[in-house]
Amino acid sequence: LRPKRESGARRALHEFLAVPLAIILGFVLLAVVTSVLDGLDVGWLQPVVRALAKVAPPSENQSMLRTVAPGMLSLLSITFVLLLTLVHRMADVFTWVVVEQFLQRRDNQAFFGYFAGLSSYFVVVLTLVDPDQAVFSTVAALVSSVAALVALVVFGYLVLDQLRPPSVVERIVQLTIATRADQVKWLRRVRDEPVLTELPGTPVQAECSGYLVDIDLDTLGRALGTARGAAEIEFRIRLGSHMVAGSDLATVRAEDPGDRERLADAVLDALRCGRERQLDREPRYGVHQLSSMGWASATQRDPEAALVTVDGLHTLLAYWTQKRTPAADSDDNADRLPVVYRDTTIPEVLSALANIAVGAIEGGQHQTCARVLHVFAMTIPRLSPEDQRMASAQVRHALPTVTRHPFTMELDRALTELSRVLSDYGHNDIAAELDRIEEGLKHQLPGR
């Protein structure tokens, strides 16, 4: 079945398992090395053995190892259960995004690997080494155990810090910006509008289900290079879109039926699907994560997390409007692949902001609604005309929610500012609607 499904094992290694497994393997190798050293009886090693024996006397090694090992395992197990329970609890409040970010952090992976590796070290040493000779093994166990206790304190702090809404949002924003920077290079190789619409087209349909996680432009470029005449591939879905069997993936256009058949096969070979979206390949997923977190937070009674999320979306808009992707004009179309891919990342951010404003009704968060309107007012002057129209449409859909909030000074300022900006940039109908809403809210105040 095509598109080919991404390997679950490879994804697990990339997302979390690679670092812990490598560290565990390192501890197992350390256990083997110290066991071999304990079994050696060579003259040049004896001064080292006598020096270490003062720290770990052979007569006490057996009881020391059998006491330290279970104690460390119990302590680590209890701590891990408590930390994972806390992470799960925060996921209930801020959606599953918290768990996903927790798993993908390299420092968390290293701590998990260290603690599991230390446990493996104890098991191997107790199995292989004669307790009366376990000098090197015992010293290594003591040093590693002290380091584990220190690491446990550091890990506990890091987990608590990572669960703060600003930390979660900042991490998502950083990853999304980095992924977007890579995607911009990719977008410069494709068109954003078709130019060969007069040619016959053949639809390309999915044979399996999953999320589109990758498009190999090199594969498409090679296939297009073998076409006998003019040809073009227009994608109907985007990275992160969910597909099912029979979903339209793309349309291939070429005069020759054989070219269309070969290009359709190349499209299916160039795509990869997976069971979940991937932030390291698709910036829209980062926007979706912030939107989900913002919606969940906006429906709660505490506005702090929702406000932080809105600020994160504002950061993305500010960064991307400064570094806008060049449009595919007629002069540089010749340098681009005849592949059409429409980017909707900025409209996704605008939609996420409007969604959070709607969700703020449930939590009664007039602060969040005002912040969203303020972000629209700050961002609209920096958007392209097309994105400005999209922003004004999102404002129009969010307007009914404004009347459901108490009319605070913060909300009053946001409405006034947004109305002025919309009027300055030619969206007079929505600006007038904002003015009517503001006047209606003012008449509800005592003394009016």
What are these language model-derived features?
Residues 10-11, 15-44:
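Hydrophobic alpha-helical transmembrane segments of small proteolipidic membrane proteins, enriched
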Residues 5-23, 52-70, 94-113, 133-141, ...:
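Membrane-interface segments at loop-to-transmembrane junctions
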Residues 142-149:
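Hydrophobic or amphipathic alpha-helical targeting/insertion segments
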Residues 29-42, 55-129, 149-156, 294:
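Transmembrane alpha-helix detector for multi-pass membrane proteins
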Residues 44-54:
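Membrane-interfacial helical/loop segments at transmembrane boundaries in membrane proteins
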Residues 1-5, 10, 135-138, 153-239, ...:
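Short basic (Lys/Arg) and small-residue
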Residues 47, 91, 268-269:
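A short glycine/small-residue-enriched secondary-structure motif
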